[in-house]
Structure formats: structure tokens, C-alpha cells
Swiss-Prot record:
Function (record text): Plays an essential role in the virus replication cycle by acting as a viroporin. Creates a pore in the host endoplasmic reticulum and as a consequence releases Ca(2+) in the cytoplasm of infected cell. In turn, high levels of cytoplasmic calcium trigger membrane trafficking and transport of viral ER-associated proteins to viroplasms, sites of viral genome replication and immature particle assembly.
Assembly with partners or alone: Homotetramer. Interacts with the immature particle in the viroplasm. Interacts with host CAV1, early and late in infection. Interacts with host integrin ITGA1/ITGB1 heterodimer. Interacts with host integrin ITGA2/ITGB1 heterodimer. Interaction with microtubules blocks trafficking to the Golgi apparatus.
Swiss-Prot/TrEMBL domain comment: A disordered 28 aa C-terminal domain is presented to the cytoplasm by each subunit of the tetrameric receptor.
Protein name: Non-structural glycoprotein 4
One Pfam family in the UniProt entry: Rota_NSP4
GO biological process: monoatomic ion transmembrane transport; symbiont-mediated activation of host autophagy; viral process
Lumenal side: 1-28
Processing and modification events after translation: Mannosylated. The N-glycosyl content is primarily Man(9)GlcNAc, with a small amount of Man(8)GlcNAc.
Listed GO CC annotations: extracellular region; host caveola; host cell rough endoplasmic reticulum membrane; membrane
Keyword set includes Membrane: yes
Residue numbers on the Cytoplasmic membrane side: 52-175
Family: Belongs to the rotavirus NSP4 family.
Region annotation (Hydrophobic) ranges: 7-21, 67-85
Amino acid sequence: MEKLTDLNYTSSVITLMNSTLHTILEDPGMAYFPYIASVLTVLFTLHKASIPTMKIALKTSKCSYKVVKYCIVTIFNTLLKLAGYKEQITTKDEIEKQMDRVVKEMRRQLEMIDKLTTREIEQVELLKRIHDKLMIRAVDEIDMTKEINQKNVRTLEEWENGKNPYEPKEVTAAM
């Protein structure tokens, strides 16, 4: 029985559209006919597609408000696309999802900045320690005996009899 009433309803809508189109065609100055026909076709298609969909959705879903809201937003977005607009209507849920995504990305970037800042602070501290070590030792205080391997070399006061054993001695040879 429902199919029969849907068929009667559809035929009455088609009859209404045809009569509307005939009255538009009778006017000789009507230059916007293709646009009006396109709009009427879209409206009829949306009407025929959305009514059964909404009926099924309302019967099967527990949360009818969200379904109705989603259907209406989808219909308006379709109409906006057909009109040539690039903007779309978004629901609160979509806005909240986008906000959550933005907040998550901001947190990730803040953590990265924190890690980089910590690393930079550690590098600055390391450079400061290196600089302090270089600046504390004066040139006079550096023990070069370790560098040239002369730890066991004696000074002039430490030599026996005060003579340097490494100085060449005068040698006289017989001729």
C-alpha cells in the first residue's frame, strides 16, 4: 500500500512540475528556463531521495536529532556545491573534531619545542664548561714534561757535582 501511495505522490509531483514548466514556457520572454528547470530537477531529486532516507534513518537510529541534522547539512552542502560555492556548512561535531586535531598538533609541536629547547640548553651548558676549562688553565701552569716525555730529566741543581752529563767534553787526541 505504501508503494502505491508513493507512486501516486510521485505522479502528482511530476504533474505539478509539468504544469509549472508549461506555464513558464508560455511566457515568451522567459530566458531563465534552463536554470529553473535545473533547480526544479535538483529539488525533486533531493525530495525523493531525502524523504525515504530520513524515514529509514529515523526508524533505525536511536538518536534521531543527529540524523536529521546530518541529512539537512548534507542537503544544504549539496545545494551550495550546485550553486558553485566552495564553502560548506559544518556541524558542531565536525568543528570539535577539527579543534581536537588542531589542539593535538599544537601539543605535539610544543613537546618538540620543549625537547629542542632542552637540547639547546644542554649544549650551551656543555660549551660553557668547555670554555671554563679552557680559561682556567693559564699557559704558565701547563706541565709540558708530560707532553715531551721528559719527566725523569734533572735540572742543573739536581745533577751530581753541578755538571751537565750531556754537555760535550773536550777530547784531546794524539796525532
